[in-house]
Curated annotation (Swiss-Prot):
One of its GO terms (molecular function) is ATP binding. The lineage of its organism: Bacteria, Pseudomonadati, Pseudomonadota, Gammaproteobacteria, Thiotrichales. Heterotrimer of A, B and C subunits. This is Aspartyl/glutamyl-tRNA(Asn/Gln) amidotransferase subunit C. Signal peptide: none annotated. It comes from Hydrogenovibrio crunogenus (strain DSM 25203 / XCL-2) (Thiomicrospira crunogena). InterPro entries: Asp/Glu-ADT_sf_sub_c, GatC. Allows the formation of correctly charged Asn-tRNA(Asn) or Gln-tRNA(Gln) through the transamidation of misacylated Asp-tRNA(Asn) or Glu-tRNA(Gln) in organisms which lack either or both of asparaginyl-tRNA or glutaminyl-tRNA synthetases. The reaction takes place in the presence of glutamine and ATP through an activated phospho-Asp-tRNA(Asn) or phospho-Glu-tRNA(Gln). NCBIfam families: gatC.
Length: 95
């Protein structure tokens, strides 16, 4: 699939990026190559290929879900300039 220069201009405008006129030819060729690759990938017959959720057939080992850090919440509350009912109080910033 070949891309036209006008399409690259439109895409760059919609993406809010600036593309120099000197880069348009090179960018058009690169994007066209990527689109050609996608077309070739779509042409591959995958009818007898089972979908995969992961490239490896191994099961991940899971670690035991154990608390490894102590709770410092109360200590941090004491360090705060203002705290109430476990919440940090901050000055109002919006009227």
């Amino acid at each position: 699939m070949s891309l036209e220069k006008t399409e690259v201009d439109t895409i760059s405008r919609l993406a809010a990026i600036s593309v120099d006129a000197s880069e348009v030819d090179q960018l058009t060729a690169k994007i066209s190559n990527v689109l050609d690759l996608f077309q070739r990938m779509e042409a591959v017959d995958t009818t007898n290929v089972e979908p995969m959720s992961h490239p490896l057939d191994q099961v991940q080992r899971l670690r035991e879900d154990v608390v490894t850090e102590t709770d410092h919440h109360e200590e941090y509350q004491k360090l705060a300039p203002a705290a109430e009912k476990g919440m940090y109080l901050v000055p109002q910033v919006i009227d």
